[in-house]
Regions:
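Acceptor-binding helix/loop patch of EC 2.4 sugar-transfer enzymes
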Residues: 56-67, 108-148
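Membrane-proximal helix-turn-helix segments that form the acceptor-binding/catalytic region
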Residues: 78-86, 99-101, 120, 135-159
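Short alpha-helical donor nucleotide-sugar binding micro-motif in glycosyltransferases
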Residues: 154, 262-263, 269-273
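Conserved donor-binding/catalytic core segment of Leloir-type glycosyltransferases
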Residues: 186-187, 192-225, 234
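Nucleotide-activated donor-binding/catalytic signature segment of Leloir-type glycosyltransferases, i.e.
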Residues: 245-263
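Aromatic "clamp/platform" in nucleotide-sugar-dependent glycosyltransferases that forms part
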Residues: 281
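Short hydrophobic beta-strand element within catalytic cores of glycosyltransferases
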Residues: 298-301
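Conserved acidic donor-binding segment of nucleotide-sugar-dependent glycosyltransferases
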Residues: 313-314, 318-325, 334-339
Length: 393
């Protein structure tokens, strides 16, 4: 079985490729990223480099790029891969950059699977519009042609890989039957030592990027409402909050909030925290939650964070609705006041993370890929005739 995977950057493609290899597939990845950036990728997996000047400029020169340019780059990358993709059995493409390659791969005998970590494009755009208003910035909708490309990918795919029920539930009911839930748990390091004792200054941490999706606004509102003595909030992000009036104004009022930039070892950041929070408005999975849990840090997450679906709220974490500063403040206050609860939840969190997989093992994800392959094997090919002979992969 020959499987082609296309992704502009590594993302979780090493986990996908490794899972496919475990199930007996021969895998080739097409990407604009060199192989050295694909950590822990099985040696048997081949990689075809499809250059992208824009991706290179973003990575090496840290050149700021507009959304319009990114949309155009995904189109160009997709058509570049379509020109070189080899005949095979299955093509798995990353959402928004796979439509042309899907057509080419299907003409050459492959079946198309879409990898979509984020919610349905219409759901996500509605959320972005609402959050733009809350943060005080103009809403910039995706161009119509880019939306249509994504809708066409959904329709064209035989199956869609999604990391959570949260993502799956945003799709139309008629489409949910072809979505396979594949939790992105599998890149979680377990430090030999942790720091379960409470710090002299009660420290809450959060990790994330895009302010429109990560719920920082509600966390800052909760933090300001609490006004806890001897407490500090650490925000690990590369985002520039000065571009968002709603965030900028709150940060000016809060002296006990620090923005943390590059951290050589993210485990060091987690172990500075007494509590970790993912206040996400939109997070298809959110692996940072389990990274913190592996460091024996009790966590609070919203139900719009896909990884929260693996928690038992009140035992190994606290799950709250998104966009609710009041409930977030209550959850933080309970862990601030009740040290026994905080310690018990921290221990249970690490145990849950260990039970789900250690040292890059990913049993939940591997099982989901097995389900995908079984579904394809049990469904007859209808979209394209198989080629008479396979060329060398």
């Amino acid at each position: 079985m020959h499987v082609a995977v296309s992704t502009t950057r590594p993302f979780h493609s090493p986990m996908l490729a490794n899972a496919l290899v475990k199930h007996g597939a021969r895998v080739r990845i097409y990407s604009s990223a060199p192989r050295r950036y694909f950590r822990r990728l099985d040696e048997s997996v081949r990689l075809t480099l499809v250059p992208s000047l824009l991706q290179a400029a973003m990575h090496f020169a840290h050149v700021p790029v507009s959304q319009k340019a990114l949309h155009a780059d995904s189109w160009l990358y997709d058509h570049s891969v379509a020109a070189v993709v080899r005949p095979g059995d299955i093509f798995i493409g990353w959402a928004s950059a796979s439509l042309a390659t899907a057509h080419a791969a299907k003409r050459r005998g492959a079946r198309f699977v879409l990898d979509r970590a984020c919610p349905h494009v219409d759901f996500q755009q509605q959320m972005v519009e609402q959050e733009s208003a809350a943060l005080g910035i103009p809403y910039q909708p995706q161009p119509a042609w880019f939306r249509e490309r994504q809708l066409a990918e959904y329709a064209e795919a035989e199956r869609i890989l999604a990391p959570s029920e949260y993502t799956r539930a945003t799709f139309p009911e008629a489409m949910r039957g072809k979505i396979i839930k594949a939790p992105l748990f599998g890149r979680c390091a377990f430090p030999a030592t942790t720091h379960p004792d409470r710090h002299a200054e009660f420290t809450v941490g959060v990790v994330g990027g895009e302010p429109l999706r990560k719920g920082y606004l509600y966390l800052l509102d909760a933090w300001e409402r609490l006004a806890l003595p001897d407490a500090r909030l650490l925000i690990r992000t590369d985002a520039d909050f000065t571009h968002y009036p709603g965030l900028r104004e709150r940060l000016l009022r809060l002296s006990n909030v620090d923005i943390v930039r590059y951290v050589p070892d993210i485990n060091d950041f987690y172990q500075r925290c007494d509590v970790f929070v993912l206040p996400s408005v939109d997070d298809g999975f959110g692996m940072a939650l389990f990274e913190a849990m592996a460091n024996e840090v009790p966590c609070i997450a919203t139900s719009h964070c896909g990884s929260s679906e693996l928690l038992t709220s009140g035992r190994d974490g606290i799950v709250i609705p998104p966009r609710n500063a009041e409930l977030l403040a209550e959850a933080l206050l309970s862990l601030y006041r009740q040290e026994d609860l905080r310690r018990t939840m921290a221990s249970a969190a690490r145990a849950t993370a260990a039970a789900l997989g250690k040292d890059d093992s990913s049993p939940l994800y591997d099982a989901a890929i097995g389900t995908l392959l079984d579904c394809l094997a049990s469904t007859p090919v209808t979209a394209a005739k198989r080629p008479a002979a396979m060329t060398k992969y």
